Amino acid sequence: VEKIAGMDVEPMDMNNIPGCTYASPEISSVGYTEQAAKDAGFEIKVGKFPFSASGKASAAGHKDGFVKVIFDAKYGEWLGCHMIGANVTEMIAEAVVARKLETTGHEILKAIHPHPTMSEAVMEAVADAYDEVIHM
């Protein structure tokens, strides 16, 4: 519609559209899988954080699931994010925005994440990818 109206339209990045499955547990993802990133020629860093290590998840009784992140090892580009667990369809937005803005893993680690929250599992997974995780 914007194009028909004569507006400048930014090309859509089809690899940055979040996928959300509303089931129990919920599933969400954006970007490359590990295999797709390797197939595309990337050398990757992968981090994973289980909700069983999250204080908020434990308190809420939602300890099943995890957050997994995939980064380009050379430049730190956030290539993909995959989550399984309670409320993860709400949490994928951080990865979508970070990918859109070409945020690196180190920038995510420097951003203050609220604690205790389920969403801080994203930061913890990033920390794991960079061998800086402390809460696991």
What residues fall within each predicted segment?
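Flexible, glycine-rich terminal cap/loop adjacent to redox cofactors
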Residues: 3-6, 17, 23-136
